[in-house]
UniProtKB/Swiss-Prot annotation:
Record-stated family: Belongs to the IspH family.
Signal sequence interval, chain numbering: none
GO biological process assignments: dimethylallyl diphosphate biosynthetic process; isopentenyl diphosphate biosynthetic process, methylerythritol 4-phosphate pathway; terpenoid biosynthetic process
Pfam families in alphabetical order: LYTB (PF02401)
Entry protein name: 4-hydroxy-3-methylbut-2-enyl diphosphate reductase
Pathway: Isoprenoid biosynthesis; dimethylallyl diphosphate biosynthesis; dimethylallyl diphosphate from (2E)-4-hydroxy-3-methylbutenyl diphosphate: step 1/1; Isoprenoid biosynthesis; isopentenyl diphosphate biosynthesis via DXP pathway; isopentenyl diphosphate from 1-deoxy-D-xylulose 5-phosphate: step 6/6
Highest rank taxon of the organism: Bacteria
Gene, per the UniProt record: ispH
Length: 333
């Protein structure tokens, strides 16, 4: 048998040897959650039932590919309710809207379909209940996010936004006999939220915790899955849009959990090949509003660059589904 030293390997043999050590760890769960699946299907079914155009207030979910695909099918996305013509069909996005927006739509005789995620609706109901019971509400979330605007709009006079640890000291004083509770946006980093809540408790000794967790199961599951692959990954690529809160949180979680680097991309072609320089293990995940076809595109991109060994790391199984708005459910026979 003829033995060949490493420096005598042919170019193709050297490439094969290098590729043999390259691997991809794919986080699971990833991608679509039950709320996003319901919201996207709401628009699809509305187009089937009523025909184009169907108007959608804001992006139905925060994903460029999904929005563009639905627009090609006849959905028209508008920033404000008043941009939809009187009497049109209008879908409210998965992020929810305030009572003022509902009234605005009613005044325009719009035929509304509410695609708000049921887990967001749960937080809306908590705000209404605690406001009715005389509480001040500290809402942990990101200023300007549609979900936060809709949730705070349920009781704007008693809801105070907490956008980061640094904002805790900017909150007004609350007397000890004033009832005080914190709630949160559903798509936040679990670890960051707990850091903020710890600071809130330090400042307000009488602050109450909510009866149940507001950060949704899908957000938590995707963060746990990313943590499971991050420490072994030279780089973690998260598929998701820049305006997606939960996708951006996955990048942050990956870095905090030990990834060498982490990047957010909408499409595989946005990956800078320099990110892979020297990398032997690449982690891949996707936000809750990302269809699996975009993840497959990233895996194909990596495969073409020698990352042939693909292993899925599963930390939870998701079986939750949500019913469509009543007007779009199949008729009972």
């Amino acid at each position: 048998m003829c033995m060949t030293s490493p420096d005598q390997l042919t170019a193709s043999e050297s490439a094969d040897t290098a590729s043999a050590h390259k691997r991809v760890l794919v986080a699971a769960p990833r991608g679509y959650c039950a709320g996003v699946d319901r919201a996207v299907e709401t628009v699809e079914k509305a187009l089937e039932k009523y025909g184009a155009p169907v108007y959608v207030r804001k992006e139905i979910v925060h994903n460029r590919y999904v929005v563009d695909t639905l627009a090609e099918r006849g959905a028209i996305f508008v920033d404000e309710t008043t941009e939809a013509p009187e009497g049109a069909h209008l879908v409210f996005s998965a992020h929810g809207v305030s009572p003022a927006v509902h009234k605005e739509a009613e005044a325009l005789s719009l035929k509304t379909l509410d695609a708000t995620c049921p887990l967001v609706t749960k937080v809306h109901n908590e705000v209404k209940r605690f406001a009715r019971d005389g509480y001040h509400i500290l809402l942990v979330g990101h200023e300007g996010h549609e979900e936060v605007e809709g949730t705070a709009g349920e009781a704007p006079d008693v809801t105070h936004l907490v956008d980061g640890v640094e904002s805790v000291d900017k909150l007004p004083e609350f007397l000890h006999d004033e009832k005080l509770i914190w709630l949160s946006q559903t798509t936040l980093s679990v670890d960051e939220t707990m850091t903020i809540v710890k600071k809130l408790h330090e400042r307000f000794a009488h602050l109450q915790d909510p009866p149940s967790d507001d950060i949704c199961y899908a957000t938590q599951n995707r963060q746990v899955a990313v943590k499971a692959i991050a420490a072994e990954s030279d780089v973690v690529i998260v598929v998701g849009s820049q305006n997606s809160s939960n996708s951006k949180r996955l990048v942050e979680v990956a870095l905090q959990a030990g990834a060498g680097a982490s990047y957010l991309v909408d499409y595989a072609h946005q990956i800078d090949e320099s990110w892979l320089d020297g990398a032997t293990t690449v982690g891949v995940s996707s936000g809750a509003s990302v269809p699996e076809i975009l993840v497959r595109g990233v895996l194909e991109f990596l495969d073409a660059r020698g990352f042939h060994d693909v292993k899925e790391i599963t930390t939870a199984a998701e079986k939750i589904t949500f019913a469509l708005p009543r007007d779009l459910r199949p008729a009972r026979t």
